[in-house]
């Protein structure tokens, strides 16, 4: 199954509160919204991708519990980006002082903040171009570091704020650099 994009703009402009309500009233459907206001219905992942997402998230949570530098999120969290888009990265992380600057209401709904770090793990049905466009959208919204992991091609694209995309072929690990100090993601099991 692939993602489906629906454009309601000629009929009605969906407000932030309406989009939030749409998501709340349809908890079994994962929605995103691009900067043009189009609604994207995201398909569920298969078992393998879901397992790898879970394992990767666990690595981030363990690191973050040890360092207490920020807040980790999984793909069920939708962020309101500065461009107006609503996106749900597979893994994301926000530095603690930035998260603490949000109001309780902002934290409760779709936080109006771009994460410092995002990770997208492609599933077999994901479009590479659409996922690359999403990664570029994150960078355009001031995300500092992003990893696009493509298990099919055994390739990782590293996105850094203000820099060219770096492409790695079958890396065994990724460093969180200065954004995620001391974090290293082991990728050996991902390529098996």
List the model feature ranges, each with a label:
Residues 1-192:
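Gly/Pro/Ser/Thr-rich low-complexity, intrinsically disordered segments predominantly at protein N-termini
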């Amino acid at each position: 199954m692939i993602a489906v994009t629906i454009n309601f703009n000629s009929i009605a402009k969906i407000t932030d509160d309406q989009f939030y309500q749409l998501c709340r009233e349809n908890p079994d459907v994962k929605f995103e919204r691009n900067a043009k206001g189009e609604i994207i219905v995201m398909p569920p992942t298969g078992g393998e991708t879901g397992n790898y997402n879970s394992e990767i998230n666990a690595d981030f949570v363990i690191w973050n519990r040890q360092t207490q530098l920020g807040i980790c999120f999984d793909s069920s969290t939708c962020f309101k980006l500065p461009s107006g888009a609503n996106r749900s990265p597979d893994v994301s992380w926000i530095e603690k002082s930035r998260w603490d600057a949000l109001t309780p209401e902002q934290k409760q709904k779709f936080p109006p903040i771009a994460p410092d770090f995002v990770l997208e793990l492609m599933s077999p049905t994901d479009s590479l171009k659409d996922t690359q466009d999403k990664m570029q959208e994150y960078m355009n919204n001031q995300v500092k570091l992003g990893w696009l992991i493509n298990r099919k091609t055994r390739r990782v694209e590293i996105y850094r704020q203000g820099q060219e995309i770096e492409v790695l072929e079958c890396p065994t690990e990724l460093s969180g650099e200065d954004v995620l100090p001391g974090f290293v993601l082991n990728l050996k099991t991902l390529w098996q």
